[in-house]
């Protein structure tokens, strides 16, 4: 869960043109806070992206700082980087829940983000 948290934070920080510090030291200590903040980051990032025009989106960069070294990458790297990685790990969580007898409620519509 912490890894998905940091991935969602990276996506959100990118929408603010904010630096992503590695390693991330600002991580909540309990499951509920991690889950809640992860969902909030994704919701806020979605809203921020929908307010951008194509030129603003094109100019946006993902920025990282690690040990004093700064690196930046095109916004498109969010797709094959943090977003793809978060989807992959979410699938792992779903699989683990099934194998331990705790599957996700079948009335959940993942595509719509709602219950049927």
Specify the residue positions occupied by each region the protein language model found.
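Short, contiguous alpha-helical
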Residues: 1-24, 65-116
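Acidic/histidine-rich alpha-helical segments that form the ligand environment
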Residues: 29-66, 70-95
């Amino acid at each position: 869960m912490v890894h998905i948290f940091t991935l969602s934070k990276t996506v959100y920080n990118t929408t603010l043109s904010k630096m992503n510090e590695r390693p991330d030291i600002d991580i909540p200590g309990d499951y509920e806070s991690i889950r809640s903040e992860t969902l909030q980051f994704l919701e806020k990032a979605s809203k921020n992206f929908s307010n951008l025009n194509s030129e603003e989106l094109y100019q946006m960069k993902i920025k990282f700082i690690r040990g004093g070294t700064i690196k930046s990458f095109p916004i498109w790297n969010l797709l094959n980087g943090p977003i793809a990685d978060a989807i992959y790990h979410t699938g792992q969580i779903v699989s683990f829940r099934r194998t331990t007898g705790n599957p996700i409620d079948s009335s959940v519509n993942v595509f719509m983000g709602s219950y049927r």
